[in-house]
Amino acid sequence: MNTMSHKFVLALDEGTTSARAILFDSDLNIVNIGQYEFPQHYPQPGYVEHDPEEIWEAQMLAVKKAISKIDAKQIVAIGITNQRETTVLWDAKSGKPVYNAIVWQDRRTSPITDWLKANYFKMIKDKTGLVPDPYFSASKIKWILDNVSNVREKAERGEIKFGTIDTYLIWRLTNGKAHVTDYSNASRTMLFNINKLEWDREILELLKIPESILPEVKPSSEIYGYSEALGNLIPISGDAGDQQAALFGQVAFNVGEIKATYGTGSFILMNIGNNPIRSENLLTTIAWGLEKNKAKYALEGSIFITGAAVQWFRDGLRAIDVSDEIEPLASSVEDNGGVYFVPAFVGLGAPYWDPYARGLIIGITRGTTKAHIARAILESMAYQTRDVIEVMQKESSISINSLKVDGGAAKDNLLMQFQADIIGIKVIRPKVMETTSMGVAMLAGLGVGLWNSLEELRSIWKVDKEFIPSMSEEKRRALYSGWKEAVKRAMGWAKVVGGQV
């Protein structure tokens, strides 16, 4: 094939354990993929860090592999998507990080966020759409400023830059010329006012974070700068947090369109349009912004354990040798045999938010086999997804007609059919499952005019399979009511027995 006439978009997908680079053509087909892992560092219990230099090296190796079969001059745009919230501070002159990146999973800043929760919960939720938690960037920045020698002094003098990983990579790719982020990543820092679309001075003053260290916030599709890292000048023109990029990559451009990504845990995002909706049990976040001072918003629910339960079935119970064996095993029985599995290994996330819940298998009889447990594990992913979607519908008053899916478990036909059955809506699986990278490739291509409209992108996007609900309402109600009873029994367990939280 003569590729010289082709135009390509390069998506950099910087995750929690690996850096990936995916090359897309103008029809959004995947041309090549590069992926390199990098280590996580655990200096103390509850601490999770990355070396930013290792991230950069892994990312550039992934790029080299992804573009190995083409001429870099054919790349018309670069897009960046990233693990959200992870925090880097670096020296503005030398570009060297002043401390390791503090990862989103890190819990060291719990005392700071406990104080915020006790005293400023409503103010922070109203302004940022988030709840005070170590998960978000704000307390991580404060920790570095307070605990790393001379950093606060340098920050006060304007000599320190902060960024989430997208910002750090754009800075490196442009040789320090661009210190920017997009609306979606800014909305995960707990410092960004999602109503006014600007850094919030009240929160910055509360945490004593100088505004000078923060990047400029721009739309998710715009030329931020140019990179010479591949030998010629290429515009960097797309930027979005990983879950928001996946929503865009699922062409969920309309209000009420929703996607679920099934990974170790699951993330469910729903497009709620031009106005943020206040939610009791979910996060309100910015989905993306395609113009200055305009944003699309989303409700987000995070489920802590979905795919990780399959890993536990494989490694903890040694019930299967490889993860792919769970679907045929679960398919070997007609139903769950009355068995429910609540995967509350680390508590329950949305919409329960119970850190004291613990894992539970209930309904076991003498006739229960490992196939029934396998089925109950798969079904738990679908039940938890319904839990979140029900709250989304209730709190937004938006009706949901279908669910778009991606991530590892979305390849499982048994699970996807059960997902459609238990919610009672159509489940749609796309042809290209790399929706996070595809989403930011779309944003980058829009930013340079490779594609001209959302309608054009929607017409290119292809469906692999649709799963239509076939379960009776009576059966659906009975199964879901059993799940809710099982969850009740799992909640608060660590408090009752004094187990470790």
Swiss-Prot record:
It catalyses: glycerol + ATP = sn-glycerol 3-phosphate + ADP + H(+). Key enzyme in the regulation of glycerol uptake and metabolism. Catalyzes the phosphorylation of glycerol to yield sn-glycerol 3-phosphate. Sn-glycerol 3-phosphate binds at T16, R84, E85, Y135, D242. It comes from Saccharolobus islandicus (strain M.16.27). This is Glycerol kinase. Pathway: Polyol metabolism; glycerol degradation via glycerol kinase pathway; sn-glycerol 3-phosphate from glycerol: step 1/1. Glycerol binds at R84, E85, Y135, D242, Q243. Its EC number is 2.7.1.30. Keywords: ATP-binding, Glycerol metabolism, Kinase, Nucleotide-binding, Transferase.
